[in-house]
From Swiss-Prot:
It holds the Pfam family ANP. The keyword Cytoplasm does not apply. This is Natriuretic peptide PpNP-a. Expressed by the venom gland.
Amino acid sequence: SGSKTANIGDGCFGVPIDHIGSTSGMGCGSPRPKPTPGGS
């Protein structure tokens, strides 16, 4: 829904990568250079 968030973090869960990716590493954009459709 938020192009800004998807553009910057590309969070698979719809959450800002800057937050979850840094803490839990669940962000598909943080741990991986290219987020894979399907999660994990």
